[in-house]
Amino acid sequence: MTRLGSQGKEFPMMNLNETAARHGFCVDRVRESEELHGKMVEMHHKKTGAQLVWVDNGEVNKTFCVAFKTLPEDSTGVFHILEHSVLCGSAKYPVREPFVELMKSSMATFLNAMTFPDKTIYPVSSRNEQDFLNLAEVYLDAVFAPRILQDPNIFYQEGWHIELDENGAPLYKGVVFNEMKGAMSDVDEQIYQKTLDVLFPDNCYGWNSGGDPKHIPDLTYEQFLRMYRRYYHPSNARIFLDGAVPLDKVLTLAEEYLSCFDRLDEKHEIPMQKPFAAEAEQAYEIGAEEDTADKTMLTLAKIVAPWSDTVRVTATEILFDVLTGSNDAPLKKALLATGKCQDVGMSLDNAMAQPYMMLTLRNIADGSEQELRQMIRDTVQQLVKTGLDKDALTASINSSEFSARQPGEPSGLLRCIHALDAWLYGGDPMQPLLSEERYQKLREMAAGDDFDRLMAELLLDESTMSIIRTVPSHTQGDELRAEETERLQAIQAAWTDADKEALRVQNEKLTAWQQTPDTAEQLATLSLIHISEPTRPEPIS
């Protein structure tokens, strides 16, 4: 059997098909790519529908990642808590802190997990084959057989629980709860979350995927488990491989876990948000000794394009670099010259189904908002009239293309994240990894007036633009802390004697669990075999 590669070249498929079939997989497509320095293999697990992509490029630094589409339905941070919790021990590896133990012995070049607004990923990289396989198995066991299913202590530790202080007053505790209290005290995080809230009221992006401290305590252990079972399923899984991976061994590991499940039909679709104009205001805390004058942040935000329009998305990034990439960039220079703002920045978030832009003016002078917005209009209108500097556009395109072709390390992880920019939404996982055709189109755009028209669409058309004001406050922090205290006091006031005893027992069990060290037998499950030299498997043709 043969297949045509993307360059029209034929190559045999028999060995690859046999290898896949042996482990319950079916090869869907194989394409060669000069840009990827190898080929992309796509397959699916026949029983569950789990998808797998392998970028077979001979890289010694091998990457494995299992990813799930995770769509928040509220701001409890359930998927952030799950990301932490599944890595607190599993059926084969019942160690309380596998990360800590793995870092002591593994040769991993990357070892982490990440929660995004619409996905959660578990990537590892290693140059050592045996280490790579061990890491892949630990992660597969973590996501498909976690101890959270039997041990609620993990949820209480990583998510939230109530403790009583020395005076008997209730307090919220929990790793994610504390992490997000810190994150949400940062003004940049507040601007980011408010922007999502305003732009996306009708889909998952409007929720705080990391968790809002005001809403994290709304999550129950039962809800936590329901969301795990609904989303952490092979039918919703995407497995990404990159480099000189031992495919037969990886598929053996994967099949061991996938075969335990039956297919689920839920597709977890993301409805597209219809763009609209909106205005919003929020407060952020400053120190009691600080003056509130000239401390307002002004953000202009807009949905840019659907995920599939990679040319427009990349063009927007290039445009922002030309407009605000340095103090001499025309838009930033004009705004700073007014003396009415301290800094200007533009950003684009493209790791989602609907990439969006933000233009933020920091520490603007009180009463200067309309003047600054008019300066944006006047500057952009003048640039549209005269045309953007062609040399600046060319330089930015060249820099962007270099970054796309040389993504840095671990390159396999970056390819995985980029592939998910299309793959997660039903698109071609190869599309975001190929840059030659895209940059050819961008150069054609730069030769004409396409960038000028894009600039006008994004910055002059306010019919779909959101305006977010983030204003300083001496009382915001105190108000939030008082609100939390009042909530806890109300909860405590409603406790029955049975509730008090249940909390005491729960916290005693949690403390005992936390203070019980892993046994030698448990730690031995993570002992890794070290090989002095990286190994490269024989390629499967």
How would you label these PLM feature ranges?
Residues I529-E533, P537-I540:
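Single conserved hydrophobic/aromatic residue that forms the stacking wall/gate
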Residues K9-T63:
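Non-catalytic terminal extensions that flank enzyme cores
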Residues G89-A91, L135-L149, E166-S235, D248, ...:
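Scaffold signal of the M16-like zinc-metallopeptidase fold and its non-catalytic homologs
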Residues F11-A20, R238-T296, T386, L488-E501:
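An aromatic/glycine/proline-enriched structural segment found at the starts
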Residues L298-D391:
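Structured mid-domain segments that build the active-site/substrate or prosthetic-cofactor binding neighborhood
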Residues G38, D56-D141, A145, N153, ...:
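M16/MPP (pitrilysin/insulinase) zinc-metallopeptidase core fold and M16-derived inactive scaffolds
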Residues A447-R481:
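Extended, domain-scale alpha-helical bundle/helix-rich regions
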Residues P146-N178, P246, D265-E279, T379-C416, ...:
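Acidic/histidine-enriched alpha-helical segments
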